């Protein structure tokens, strides 16, 4: 059974790409992401944010969720919660990479949060997609790969997000790995490569991995090793006592 898809437009870089919205997908514009949906002629089902990065007018209506500027949850997490609470488990996220490095790191952290709750987020960057996988396997379909062209069109990198990731196997790539343990302080999985007309997989038995792959690839199929419970929580518009000034 296919997962409900949510496409989120954030306020970061789009690298000249035209986002693709699958039929039936939920569309959420997060703050300045509304500038992009308007420019593309895409109707957002929900608009959310404190609107500090929006350059056009703030819409009014029941589908606009205005957040305070001081809060614990960043706008992207709030958008993810809205999508999750409406049944989405696959999130395609544009404009969440590039620009401020702290925003980029936060976006990558949020893909790990999704993975650890049984969802998946794909962050679209400059010719690359970033995702996270937790206790699961990613399967990439075989396709033609040009071994002499731009290396980014075949590059795959794998990082441990959890303190350690156990039972990591990489199959069908230029450099294979079997039942290894990766840690988040030793970088061993950078710059692997997809091979021509060869299916590939990245598997982690226990732990969370961050994976980057070419945006020209079809999105991988995900097989989870167990059921996941819990959710992302309710929309939070408060500042915790630990952060209060």
Give residue spans per PLM region.
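General beta-strand structural signal in soluble alpha/beta enzymes
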Residues: 9, 28-30, 49, 65-66, ...
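Short phosphate-binding loop-to-helix
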Residues: 64-85
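Anionic-ligand-binding alpha/beta catalytic cores of soluble enzymes and soluble regulatory domains
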Residues: 92-141
């Amino acid at each position: 059974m296919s997962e409900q898809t949510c496409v989120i437009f954030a306020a970061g870089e789009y690298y000249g790409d035209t986002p693709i919205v699958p039929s039936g997908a939920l569309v959420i514009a997060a703050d300045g992401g509304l500038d992009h949906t308007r420019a593309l002629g895409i109707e957002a089902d929900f608009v959310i944010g404190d609107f500090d990065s929006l350059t056009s007018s703030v819409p009014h209506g029941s589908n606009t969720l205005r957040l305070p500027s001081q809060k614990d949850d960043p706008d992207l997490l709030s958008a993810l919660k809205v999508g999750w609470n409406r049944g989405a488990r696959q999130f395609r996220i544009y404009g969440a990479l590039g620009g401020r490095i702290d925003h980029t790191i936060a976006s990558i952290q949020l893909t790990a949060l999704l993975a650890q709750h049984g969802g998946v987020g794909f962050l679209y960057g400059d010719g690359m997609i970033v995702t996270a996988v937790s206790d699961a396997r990613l399967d990439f379909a075989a396709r033609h790969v040009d071994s002499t062209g731009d290396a980014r069109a075949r590059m795959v990198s794998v990082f441990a997000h959890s303190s350690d990731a156990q039972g990591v196997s990489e199959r069908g790539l230029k450099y294979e790995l079997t039942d290894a343990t990766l840690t988040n302080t030793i970088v061993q999985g950078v710059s692997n490569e997809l091979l021509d007309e060869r299916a590939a997989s990245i598997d982690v038995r226990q732990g969370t991995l961050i994976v980057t792959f070419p945006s020209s690839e079809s999105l991988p199929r995900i097989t989870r090793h167990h059921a996941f419970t819990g959710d992302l929580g309710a929309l939070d518009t408060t500042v915790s006592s630990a952060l209060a000034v």
